């Protein structure tokens, strides 16, 4: 697809090809469009079927490391399935068409993540990935998925955006980024692509809730309560991830701290 | 099933759509494409184009809501992933048809009031029947309603609109070509995936047949409403096409569609060919998945 034409709506003095040169309404229309999504993903998906460059040699993993990677990827699949089902349910809840179209792009992103992780499991010799995912899923991430889908089923848009686009995306962003540094080359490339998507999803959550809370400051208390409730599940999921990734004891608190700081940095709850 | 579903993966979708027939397009058409001045400057054609585009938006909004709802209901990951691509396809359709309304001069702040004003109530009821199935968590009925009935109707209507726009409005015709390619994929998934589920759940047949009959009734009622109001715009469109052809020193050409000469057929004939074509498609597609097509009553 070609570059979208942004010039007409751009403010004087700003680069008219940059979304940030647009007024607020035009900005949202632009960054939540199919065209914007495609241009964003094109850069890091082009030439990477299944999330990595096909010529990349697959490292020989020792059996223990391979087992750990399979368990880790199975739990990533639970998180991505939660994100996929959550995001798809949220399309109907979105308060306007721009948000609805953005959520549709997120649905496709989450489905792609699920697909590339399942494909990687297949490459690692897992013959029935769906069964393996069920077998190896940690209770905390499964419980988080149920909680998220309950919020979606209840039609609670703000809480669902918070649980999915802030908490779950931050958890995944933190764990995937950490894992990408130590993973085998193919898994690392897959994770880098996924992290690029998560960044966009986080941006949507931060922006949507930030704007909402300006007009509805009392809703902050409710979101803090939800966070308090879900944090224990997130920490449980992180605990599971520690073991799967084979982290040393000294490194473990760092990942939890990274997650909490990442949520804090969004500034939604402060 | 696994092999067939591998043809509906995100990877395949990326290669076929954004990196395939949508490459080098903006809002579904070539960059720089615009609505023809003969349409924008003609009050009758402009209003008719706005009304038509609103029906497309209403249908695609329903498809977006339904396909996203079906992701959660799908029984396996592969179907969820396909429905995720369909969700994004439908969102793209909402976006490109909404953009067309803006290209036709509808102000952004008037979008919803324009949709409310022109959306046909029978089409809205058609959509509600489908969305009720999705809300009830009925995956099989939802996919039949969405991927066979709604998509089957959209596919045929888009083909008709594409045939009538090819000469006068290449920009809109190209936009429609991309959506037709999408709809073809959606209908294919519906047929392939649901056949096996229907044979596993034969008790669902009766309910699904009633849904198809009811949706078909409201589809025919929509066609009847739209065509009964379109005589003037069809005649005006033909006059403009003839004038343009005369200016270019040729004739308007033969726009034939399913045996009907779109340049001379009466509005009633075109409506009849459209209805017969859609219902014929329903009959053969439903037959392939083991559902017996039910003739709807004819709207008054």
Map each language-model feature to its residues.
Chain B
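Non-heme di-metal
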Residues: 1-300
């Amino acid at each position: 697809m070609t570059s979208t034409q942004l010039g007409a709506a751009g403010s004087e003095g700003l680069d008219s090809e940059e979304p940030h040169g647009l007024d607020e309404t035009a900005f949202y229309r632009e960054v939540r469009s199919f065209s914007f999504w495609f241009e964003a993903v094109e850069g890091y998906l082009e030439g990477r079927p299944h999330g990595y460059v096909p010529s990349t040699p697959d490292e020989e993993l020792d059996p223990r490391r391979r087992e750990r990677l399979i368990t880790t990827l199975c739990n990533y699949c639970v998180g991505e399935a939660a994100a996929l089902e959550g995001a798809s349910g949220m399309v109907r809840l979105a308060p306007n068409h721009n948000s609805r179209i953005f959520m549709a792009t997120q649905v496709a992103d989450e489905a792609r993540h699920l697909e590339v992780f399942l494909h990687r499991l297949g490459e690692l010799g897992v013959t029935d990935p769906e069964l393996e995912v069920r077998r190896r899923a940690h209770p905390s991430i499964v419980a988080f998925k149920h909680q998220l889908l309950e919020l979606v089923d209840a039609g609670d848009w703000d809480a669902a955006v918070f649980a999915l686009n802030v908490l779950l995306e931050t958890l995944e962003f933190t764990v995937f980024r950490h894992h990408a540094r130590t993973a085998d080359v193919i898994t690392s490339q897959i994770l880098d692509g996924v992290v690029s998507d998560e960044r966009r999803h986080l941006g949507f959550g931060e922006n949507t809730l930030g704007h909402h809370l300006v007009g509805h400051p009392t809703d902050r208390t409710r979101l803090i309560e939800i966070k308090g409730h879900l944090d224990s599940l997130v920490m449980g999921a992180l605990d599971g991830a520690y073991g799967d990734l084979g982290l040393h004891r000294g490194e473990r608190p760092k990942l939890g701290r990274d997650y909490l700081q990442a949520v804090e940095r969004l500034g939604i709850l402060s | 099933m696994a092999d067939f579903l591998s043809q509906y993966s995100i990877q395949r979708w990326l290669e076929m759509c954004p990196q395939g027939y949508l490459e080098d397009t903006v809002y579904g058409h070539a960059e720089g494409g615009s609505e023809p001045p003969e349409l924008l400057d003609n009050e009758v054609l402009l209003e008719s184009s706005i009304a038509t585009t609103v029906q497309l938006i209403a249908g695609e909004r329903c498809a977006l809501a339904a396909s996203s709802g079906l992701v959660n209901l799908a029984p396996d990951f592969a179907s969820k992933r396909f429905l995720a691509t369909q969700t994004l396809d439908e969102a793209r359709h909402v976006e490109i048809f909404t953009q067309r309304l803006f290209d036709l001069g509808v102000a952004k702040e008037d979008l919803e009031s324009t949709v409310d004003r022109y959306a046909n109530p029978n089409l809205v009821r058609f959509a509600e029947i489908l969305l009720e199935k999705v809300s009830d968590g009925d995956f099989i009925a939802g996919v039949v309603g969405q991927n066979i009935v709604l998509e089957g109707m959209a596919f045929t209507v888009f083909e008709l609109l594409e045939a009538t726009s090819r000469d006068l409005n290449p920009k809109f015709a190209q936009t429609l070509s991309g959506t037709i390619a999408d709809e073809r994929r959606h209908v294919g998934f519906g047929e392939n995936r649901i056949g096996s589920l229907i044979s596993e759940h034969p008790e669902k047949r009766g309910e699904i047949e009633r849904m198809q009959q009811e949706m078909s009734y409201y589809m025919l009622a929509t066609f009847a409403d739209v065509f009964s109001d379109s005589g003037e715009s069809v005649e005006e469109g033909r006059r403009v096409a003839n004038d343009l052809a005369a200016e270019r020193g040729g004739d308007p050409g033969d726009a034939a569609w399913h045996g009907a000469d779109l340049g001379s057929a009466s509005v009633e004939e075109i409506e009849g060919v459209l209805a017969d074509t859609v219902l014929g498609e329903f009959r053969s597609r439903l037959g392939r998945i083991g559902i017996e097509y039910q003739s709807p009553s004819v709207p008054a």
